[in-house]
């Protein structure tokens, strides 16, 4: 049974890259399906142990709190939540949403910036005059998997009882190792299970820190307080002397677990607790509020948003973009932060606008006001993304484009061609931009998800707004002899579907599938082969003949069928797989839900 037991002694994870900033990227990992199955079993067996171990420290501001509910109630805001980012379940909202994305519900702050905007942070500033920010150096890459045993029992006991195989620590240790090439040095970056693993270890480190400081006559809540968001540690104290004591205790406790502080990233602030980035964000929020007031008129009586008459759209766009640049002139990283924040904020404004006006009737003379509003939003969004491409930004553009395209088609169809053409034109501008060229040359061996997601953005506009075969070939170098990557294959199949215009490209995509899956003897350990096999055999745009060939090859490689019945078995399994939904979603609505869940999966 190809969808059944895929257990393997050692699985390889597959790395993919997302853009971190203008000069670097972040590597994330895909878990093999076999590892995912083992994690599900592990959660079921040790779910309450995990919750207990993640609730021992009062330093943590984000950790699993309880098991997420399997049920949901109807949510009247479902239309908004199809696009609005909730992603991770909190204890207070888990019953609101149809699609839960985590086994656990979480307490604390969803995003780190929520903590800095909180009343709790204000209270800590009133109480303490010194604030230090500490960073753990290469945290996930440095975590030693065996240290999970040290975090919930004594280190010496763990080492002297290494033959104990079924304890929580030994099972978790083995699970993390086998999912990562049997490597005990470092854990995968990306999956939720890695963050839970790290949280359990840091909960013990938190307690060690508190004990060291108690021995030094320093009490949490009186002399200092610590707040920790995964591996970001924030120290509040009455003086620099006490802050230094806390720093030393943190450093000492980390070293027990083969971790260390990145001294160059330690930031020290006295009241008021305002950094340059905080100042920039406050100014950006003010500028954003002014922009929204220029564009929209709120009607309190019926909760509607109406577009205002804009005398000079280009002036508004240029003026706002220049204001943001000038605020970030002295700090390039602030500009990255600003772009990411504004892309999400402007997307939310556009979705809110669509939601509030979805069932309204409009006079013909007012339709141009809607076009002007959308053109300003679209131009600003694509400008911010093009100068600073990011994975999260590309997902926001997908959400915006889907919402706006649907709104235009249903509510203001006469204006739809103008607005959709504007979005399509800006997609082309991105693919011709210097930033896209830089990404393509900088990471020539990897097609980054930012660029692939932009292809999905253009597909949201409908069949009348498709890239030409020439453009597709140019953007993704499809005509070359190289084998396309897993993500390229999936996105291109989603984009071209069964459109005969792209028959040559489809042939190259199918050829790449067969090249990658020519040898499936290691499919039970190779993440990329396992993913591609299931995606290809469940894709509605592949011919049955190609699917049968792949299934037959898999059955032969895994020894799951007799050579006497291999032909019949392959056909039967192919038909069975047609009803299976794997990771990718082949229709637009399901793809948007998938993109939403994969928005860097906001576990923390």
Name what the model sees in each region.
Residues 8, 19-23:
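Nucleic acid-processing catalytic cores of prokaryotic defense/repair systems
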Residues 28-131:
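Active-site-proximal segment of RNA-dependent polymerases
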Residues 39, 43, 148, 247-251:
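Short amphipathic C-terminal alpha-helix that caps PH/PH-like domains
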Residues 48, 214-218, 259:
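Short aromatic/hydrophobic-glycine micro-motifs
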Residues 48-72, 155-164, 281-287, 292-295:
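Internal, charge-rich low-complexity segments
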Residues 123-230, 235-244, 297-532, 536-604:
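Conserved polymerase palm-domain catalytic core
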Residues 240-319:
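Polymerase palm active-site segment centered on the conserved acidic dipeptide of motif C
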């Amino acid at each position: 049974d190809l969808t059944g037991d895929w257990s393997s002694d050692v699985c390889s994870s597959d790395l993919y890259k997302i853009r971190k900033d203008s000069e670097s990227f972040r590597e994330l990992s895909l878990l093999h399906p076999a590892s995912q199955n083992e994690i599900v079993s592990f959660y079921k067996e040790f779910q309450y142990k995990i919750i207990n171990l993640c609730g021992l420290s009062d330093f943590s501001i984000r950790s699993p709190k309880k098991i997420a509910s399997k049920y949901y109630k109807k949510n009247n805001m479902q239309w908004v939540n199809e696009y609005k980012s909730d992603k991770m379940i909190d204890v207070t909202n888990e019953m609101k949403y149809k699609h839960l994305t985590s086994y656990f519900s979480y307490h604390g702050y969803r995003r780190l910036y929520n903590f800095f905007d909180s009343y709790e942070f204000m209270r800590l500033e009133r109480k303490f005059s010194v604030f230090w920010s500490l960073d753990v150096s290469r945290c996930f890459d440095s975590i030693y998997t065996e240290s999970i045993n040290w975090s919930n029992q004594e280190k010496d006991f763990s080492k002297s009882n290494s033959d104990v195989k079924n304890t929580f620590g030994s099972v978790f240790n083995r699970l993390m190792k086998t999912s990562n090439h049997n490597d005990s040095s470092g854990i995968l970056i990306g999956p939720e299970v890695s963050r839970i693993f790290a949280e359990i270890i840091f909960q013990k480190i938190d307690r060690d820190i508190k004990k060291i400081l108690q021995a030094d006559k320093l009490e949490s809540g009186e002399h200092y307080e610590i707040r920790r968001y995964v591996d970001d540690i924030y120290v509040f104290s009455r003086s620099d002397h006490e802050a230094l004591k806390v720093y030393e205790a943190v450093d000492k406790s980390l070293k027990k677990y083969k971790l260390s502080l990145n001294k160059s990233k330690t930031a020290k602030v006295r009241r008021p607790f305002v950094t340059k980035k905080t100042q920039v964000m406050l100014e950006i929020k003010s500028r954003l509020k002014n922009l929204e007031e220029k564009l929209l008129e709120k009607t309190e009586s019926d909760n509607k948003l109406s577009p205002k008459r804009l005398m000079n759209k280009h002036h508004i766009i240029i003026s706002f973009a220049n204001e943001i640049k000038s605020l970030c002139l002295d700090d390039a990283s602030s500009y990255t932060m600003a772009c990411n924040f504004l892309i999400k904020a402007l997307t939310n404004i556009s979705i809110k606008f669509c939601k509030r006006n979805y069932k309204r009737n409009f006079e013909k003379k007012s339709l141009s006001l809607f076009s002007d509003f959308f053109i300003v939003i679209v131009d600003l969004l694509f400008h911010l993304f093009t100068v600073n491409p990011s994975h999260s930004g590309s997902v926001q553009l997908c959400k915006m484009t889907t919402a706006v395209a649907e709104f235009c088609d249903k509510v203001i169809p006469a204006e739809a061609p103008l607005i959709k053409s504007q979005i399509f034109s800006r997609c082309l501008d991105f693919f011709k931009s210097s930033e896209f060229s830089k990404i393509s040359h900088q990471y020539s061996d990897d097609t980054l998800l930012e660029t692939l997601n932009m292809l999905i953005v253009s597909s949201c506009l409908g069949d009348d707004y498709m890239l030409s075969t020439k453009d597709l070939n140019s953007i993704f170098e499809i005509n070359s002899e190289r084998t396309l990557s897993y993500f390229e294959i999936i996105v291109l199949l989603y984009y071209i579907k069964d459109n005969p215009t792209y028959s040559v490209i489809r042939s190259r995509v199918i050829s790449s599938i067969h090249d990658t899956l020519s040898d499936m003897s290691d499919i039970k350990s190779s993440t990329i082969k396992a993913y591609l096999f299931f995606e290809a055999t469940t894709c509605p745009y592949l011919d049955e003949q190609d699917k049968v060939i792949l299934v037959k090859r898999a059955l032969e490689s895994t020894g799951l069928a007799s050579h006497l019945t291999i032909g019949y078995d392959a056909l039967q399994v192919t038909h069975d797989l047609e009803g299976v939904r794997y990771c990718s979603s082949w229709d637009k609505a399901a793809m948007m839900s998938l993109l939403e869940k994969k928005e860097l999966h906001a576990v923390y």
